Design a protein with these regions (language model features):
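STAS-like cytosolic regulatory interaction modules
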Residues: 1-77, 91-152
Length: 152
């Protein structure tokens, strides 16, 4: 892990959740963490994720994920997503499965481009935006129009 990452800790109580907002920089990317709900962490990356910082990102994410039951990984602000970043994302997925942690990925166009090539089986849980991801983790589904009435 690069020395540009500074250790930090997530909120320890629900009252701290609204105030938590942490940032760090690694290579060509900025990572931030927020706690929109006490048991859910929002981990955001902006810029470039590549061989220089992909493992730093996973370490940053897992450090905060250790204190959450649910995670949203917001990569919608990623401008370049290299194959090392895909490999790191796979590592994140495996580590979350081992920890029985739920997570959802919000990809941007650069991330989607590589996922179409490297993840044809769509193994990562994807949502279009952070709000939809949060709703999915809470178990809320999008309301669908019912075309047939159910018997009472």
């Amino acid at each position: 892990m690069s020395s540009s990452l500074s250790p930090s800790s997530p909120p320890t109580s629900p009252s701290d959740a609204d105030r938590a907002d942490e940032h760090t920089r690694s290579g060509g990317a900025t990572f931030s963490t927020g706690w929109p709900e006490p048991s859910c962490v929002l981990i955001t990356a902006r810029g470039d994720l590549d061989a220089a910082n992909a493992n730093d990102f996973v370490d940053w994410a897992m450090q905060h994920a250790a204190h959450a039951k649910r995670m949203v990984l917001d990569l919608s602000g990623i401008e370049f997503f290299g194959t090392a970043a895909f490999s790191a994302l796979h590592t994140f997925n495996v580590r979350c499965a081992g920890a029985r942690a739920e997570w959802v990925l919000v990809p941007g166009s650069a991330v989607l481009r590589l996922l179409r090539i490297c993840d044809p089986d769509a193994m990562f849980p994807l949502c279009d935006d952070v709000d939809t991801a949060m709703a999915a983790l809470r178990g809320e589904s999008q309301r669908l129009l019912k075309l047939v009435a159910e018997p009472r």
